[in-house]
Amino acid sequence: MTEMASFQGTYSNISSFDLHRPTSIAEVCELTTRFGENYMFMGGGLDVLQMLKSGMPVENLIYLKTVPELNSVEIVSNMIRVGACVTHHAFEIHPAILKNATDLAHVWKQLGNIRIRIAGTIGGNILANSASYDALPAFLALDAVAHFEDSKGSWCVSIENVTKTKQFGLLTAIEFPIGDARVFSMDRSLKPVT
C-alpha cells in the first residue's frame, strides 16, 4: 500500500464523483457489487481527502459514517468489538474501553493530535498501513482480529495479516479479548530531533 504522507495537492485537484451514504452493511455490500472496482470507502476521511486532493480519481465515494454497525463499541462473548468507523476519541472515552481496557484508553489519548483523534477512525488507521500510525501495533499486541464482509459473506483475518490479505471487502470491526494481564503504555519522549 502507498504511504499516505506522499500525497500532496489542493482541493482544486478533486475530480467529480458520486457520493453514496448507505445506512447498513448490506447496502454497502450491494453498492460495492454494483460498482465493481470503481469506488472508494471513506470513514473519517483524513487519508482519503489527501488522496483526492492529490488528483486520485474516484467515480463513487461510499461514506461509511452513516452505517450504525460500523460506529459501535460493544462487548461480545468476553471480547471487545470496535466498529471500523469508531473515531479514536470515541474509542478512548467509551465506557466499555474505560472499564475493560483502562491502560489502552490511556494510550489512545496519546495517539496523533486532536484532529486525528476526533476525525480519524480505527479502521482507517489500520487500513492506511502507514508506519507512522499507532493503532496497528497496539492491536497486534492484543492479538486482535479484523472482521470483513462483502456480498458473498463475512470472514476474519488476524490483525497481523490485515495488510497482507488479498481478499478485500468492507472492514466492519476489530475485535480483541478482555481481561488478560497485559499492560499498555506509550512513550512519546523518543521523538526524532531535527
Could you describe each region identified by the protein language model?
Residues 1-194:
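C-terminal structural segment of proteins
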